[in-house]
Structures are given as C-alpha cells and as structure tokens.
C-alpha cells in the first residue's frame, strides 16, 4: 500500500471511531449518556437549556406528570377446604345428603364473592372395596359436588373434578375412625378478591 492509501485508510478509521464515540456521548439537555435525567444536587429540578418548551418536557420534570403504571391484578388466592364425605354422602353412595348441600351452599357463596378462576373437587375413599370400585365412587362423588355447585350458579367450565379412590389416605385405614377421615371430598377454590 502506498502512503496516500494508508493515510486515507487511517483517516477513515479515525472518522468512524470518532463518530461512534461522539454518538455514544451525545447528550441532549435532558439525559446523560446512560439515559438518566440530569437533575440538580437535591434531585428536585431537571436541567434544561434555552431551547426548552413545555412541549419538550419529559415525565417527572417541570410539571409533566409521570405516566401511571396500570394496577397489577392481585395474585389469585387459593383456599382449600376438606369435607368429610360422611357429611356429604351415605356410606358407599354418591347422592348428596342435606348436610352436604348446606356446606356446598356456603362454598358457592364464597365462590360468587370472589373473581373465581377455578374450583377443584377431589373425591377420596377409604380402603374398603376394590381399587377400581373406589376410583369410580370417588369420581361420582366429585361429579355430584360439581353438579350441585353448577345448580347454584357456578360456571361449569370453572369446576374440575377428580377421583383419587383410596390412593391418598390421610389417616390409617386400620381403624373405623381413620377410614371415616379418608372418606372425604377436598374442594379447592382459586380466585382473587373483587
């Protein structure tokens, strides 16, 4: 390469480098190179120059209001209620008893008082009977709970049912007391306050 070419190349390189540095350090009268608003030492007043107009004001300076952030929706809360199945159903049955209906009336009232996302009804049984029979019985019980809640005005698309049969005991199945505790319906309500 000859000397004029080297000189032209060096000059072009210097121009490109200088323009990059200049643009990186370009600061209008409102922000520093890092994008922060320049303010006085007490952080109360914004710096501006003679070209400032109210139309060029930025939020947080010179009376220009800061845009309000939209309110975040409260996170859904979950409440889990466990009902003994003996309260809802007779032994080996899936038809709701009057006491069970009264409790489900309270559940429906709670569900209507919130911005409901979902209700999950999970039926459980004790260990008496075959696994397949108990699974079907627990599913029928959960379906009865759903049908009743739907009859009380709860959206059926918001209610999910599941039967666990005898798979999730919370007490020993060796005693009558333990078996009674294992015959249960768990109802979980998920939603947020209105």
UniProtKB/Swiss-Prot annotation:
Chief site of localization: membrane
Pfam families hit by this protein: OmpA
Compartments, as annotated in UniProt: Cell outer membrane
Range of residues in the leader sequence: 1-24
Gene Ontology annotations of biological process type: monoatomic ion transport
Transmembrane stretches, start-end: 30-38
One MF term in the entry's GO annotations: porin activity
Domain OmpA-like: 77-193
Function: Structural protein that may protect the integrity of the bacterium.
The protein's name: Outer membrane protein A
């Amino acid at each position: 390469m000859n000397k004029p070419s080297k000189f032209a190349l060096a000059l072009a390189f210097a121009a490109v480098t200088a323009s990059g540095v200049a643009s990186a350090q370009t600061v209008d009268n409102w922000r520093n190179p890092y994008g922060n608003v320049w303010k006085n030492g007490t952080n109360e007043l914004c710096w501006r120059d003679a070209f400032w107009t109210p139309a060029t004001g930025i939020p947080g300076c010179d009376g220009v209001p800061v845009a309000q952030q939209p309110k975040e929706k409260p996170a859904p809360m979950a409440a889990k209620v466990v009902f003994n199945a003996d309260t809802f159903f007779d032994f080996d049955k899936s038809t709701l008893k009057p006491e069970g209906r009264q409790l489900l009336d309270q559940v429906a009232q709670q569900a209507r008082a919130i911005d409901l996302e979902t209700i999950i009804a999970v039926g459980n049984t004790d260990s008496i009977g075959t696994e397949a029979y108990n699974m079907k019985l627990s599913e029928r019980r959960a379906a009865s709970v759903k049908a009743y809640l739907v009859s009380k005005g709860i959206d059926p698309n918001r209610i999910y049912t599941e039967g666990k049969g005898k798979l999730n005991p919370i007490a020993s199945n060796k005693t009558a007391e333990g078996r009674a505790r294992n015959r249960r319906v768990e109802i979980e309500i998920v939603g947020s306050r209105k």
